[in-house]
Amino acid sequence: MIAAGDFRKGVTIEVDGQIFTVVDFMHVKPGKGAAFVRTKLKNIMTGAVIERTFSPTEKFEEAQIERREMQYLYNDGEFYYFMDTETYEQIPLSYDKVEEAMKYIKENMIVTVKFYKGEAFSVEPPTFVELEVIDTEPGVRGDTVTGGSKPATVETGAVIQVPLFINVGDKIKIDTRTGEYIERV
């Protein structure tokens, strides 16, 4: 059991028979009246985001999420296919379950797939990935009015802000939690 006052981002709870992940939360202590916790919850099966308010002492059952290492194989236009690295079992996942993670995942990459009661609902890329820059404008010396960064498209199609010295063909390290450039590899 977890109290609403102990919520953190990423905690998975059961509310009204459905499973939600805490996307955002805020403890509110008004001048008058009791304190409360305002939350944004994402339904793990439907992807719908709702806003709910709870008392800080209200308790919820923490959902038991299974995590498995899987290898991304391919996309057939409708589904993304992942293979369990131990059993070699393949599972298809629809775009709505993997859309955010696919910005950083390329074929044959090992990822973490989350399951609830045997059903896959989400894909988590590694914390750091190394991807090749396929398109960016050339950096001009002395052009630091924009803060010394420019947009670059990597091989998965994601657009990342990178320093001016990064060129097409460079491999860069990206933090998948924030989508930020870390270093040139």
Swiss-Prot record:
One GO molecular-function entry: translation elongation factor activity
Gene Ontology terms describing biological process: peptide biosynthetic process
InterPro entries in alphabetical order: Elong-fact-P_C, NA-bd_OB-fold, Rib_uL2_dom2, Transl_elong_fac_P/YeiP, Transl_elong_KOW-like, Transl_elong_P/YeiP_cen, Transl_elong_P/YeiP_CS, Transl_elongation_fac_P
GO CC list: cytoplasm
UniProt family annotation: Belongs to the elongation factor P family.
The UniProt record lists the keyword Cytoplasm: yes
Pfam families named in the record: EFP (PF01132), EFP_N (PF08207), Elong-fact-P_C (PF09285)
Phylogenetic classification of the source organism: Bacteria, Bacillati, Bacillota, Clostridia, Thermoanaerobacterales
Keyword terms, alphabetized: Cytoplasm, Elongation factor, Protein biosynthesis
Pathway: Protein biosynthesis; polypeptide chain elongation
Protein name: Elongation factor P
